[in-house]
Swiss-Prot record:
Its main location: secreted. Belongs to the long (4 C-C) scorpion toxin superfamily. Sodium channel inhibitor family. It comes from Tityus metuendus (Scorpion). Inhibits voltage-gated sodium channels (Nav). Has the structural arrangement of an alpha-helix connected to antiparallel beta-sheets by disulfide bonds (CS-alpha/beta). Transmembrane segments: none annotated. One of its GO terms (molecular function) is toxin activity. Disulfide bonds join C14-C65, C18-C41, C27-C48, C31-C50. This is Sodium channel toxin. GO terms for biological process: defense response.
Amino acid sequence: KKNDYPVDTAKRNCMLDCNVWDDEGYCDNFCKGRKAESGYCYKLKAACYCYGLPDDSPTKTSGRCNPNV
C-alpha cells in the first residue's frame, strides 16, 4: 500500500482538485472508492491525498498534468 496523490487516470496524470474550505469528506470518499484507508484535502495543493492506496492505483508522477488526453 502507498500514500500519495490520486490521479483521474494514469495517462492524464492530473491530481484530483478539492475545495479546501468545503471538503465535506469528498476526498475521503473518493480515496475509499479507490480502496484506500482514508483521504483528505491537502490545502497547500488543493488536491486530494490518500492513505493506504493499493500499489496498483494510479498516482501523481513527476510529469505534468495533461488534461487533453
